[in-house]
C-alpha cells in the first residue's frame, strides 16, 4: 500500500532526530572529573562541545578584540604610512621592470648567438 504524497512530505523516514528530541545521556560521576579520550583521541568533554554547537565567547572578548575605535589623528597617521608604503612598492616594482627590460634588450648577451651556415 502506497502513501499519498502529503504523508511522504510530512515525515521523512531517514532524518536524524533534532537535538531537542534526543534524550540527554547520563554521564557517570567519575567521568565528569577525569575525561577519557575517545577512539579519535578527542576527550569526551571536547566532543560534547562539538555536538552541542559553538561555545559562547567569554566576557572579556570585546576588550581583547584588535578592532578598536581610533582617534582621527591615528587614522591620518595610518593613512600616511599606507601611502608611503604604496610609493615604496611602486618604486621597487618599477626598478625590477627596468632591470628585466635591460636584461632582455641588452646588446651584449651573456651567451653567444650562433648563426647556422
UniProtKB/Swiss-Prot annotation:
Bias kind Basic and acidic residues: ranges: 1-24, 61-74
Organism the protein comes from: Bos taurus
Domain of life the protein comes from: Eukaryota
Entry keyword Transmembrane: no
Residues forming coiled coils: 73-100
Similarity comment: family membership: Belongs to the TFS-II family. TFA subfamily.
Cellular component GO terms held in the UniProt record: nucleus
Name of the protein described by the UniProt record: Transcription elongation factor A protein-like 8
Functional description taken from the UniProt entry: May be involved in transcriptional regulation.
Subcellular location: Nucleus
UniProtKB keywords: Coiled coil, Nucleus, Transcription, Transcription regulation
Keyword Transcription: yes
Region annotation Disordered: where it falls in the sequence: 1-74
Pfam family, one: BEX
